[in-house]
Amino acid sequence: MSRLTWDAVGEKFYEMGTKLGVLYPMNNTGAYDKGVAWNGLTAVTESPSGAEETKLYADDIKYASLRSAEEYGYTIEAYTYPTEWEPCDGSAQVATGVSIGQQKRQGFGFSWVTTVGNDVDDEVGQKIHIAWNSTASPSEKSYATINDNPDAITFSWECTTSPVSVTGHRPTSHMEIDCSKLKPATVKAIQDKLWGTETAEATLPSPDELIKLITDSEGQV
């Protein structure tokens, strides 16, 4: 046995950045269409909710506590968005270059990447985040006059999710993959699936399909 140590060299980890966003629009059958790159992504803010405590009392003392179901939400911020996002934001094209709002909002999946660094290297690895079964709420758009300190409009959308099944676990709508703990071949297989290749489209697999892909790849010698 050894005494605990803190802040050893190479063990001061942190996470930063948001990049490589991918949108996976959901079609009328509930399946995801091919992924499209999301340029201009500036932030993704995770905002889980729920898991609220219900206290139970018996014999004049606290007997137990129950927790409500947990929900996963997130906010996307960006300078722009792909055309495929418009139906997810409640817009419809009615003529060339003409769109209308207040339409049915299309579901979607979304993935993005954050960077892991430490005190030795500011890019030790990456984490791939995936959200399934999402819908976006209407958001404010603020337009202002151009002045001597111009700035681009930042769009923002609050997104909610409905969980999907995961074999052997409770349903979930979010997965986080720490690439630094996986073989390079496994990371490439995940990226090829989510981002596509020269011969295959970018697709969004289910949680079970991703888990199988990872476990099969990690099990190979």
Question: What is each model feature region?
Answer:
Residues 46-48, 53, 57-85, 149-163:
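Oligomerization/assembly interface segments of phage tail-like spikes and tubes
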Residues 62-137:
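Structured, beta-strand-rich domain cores
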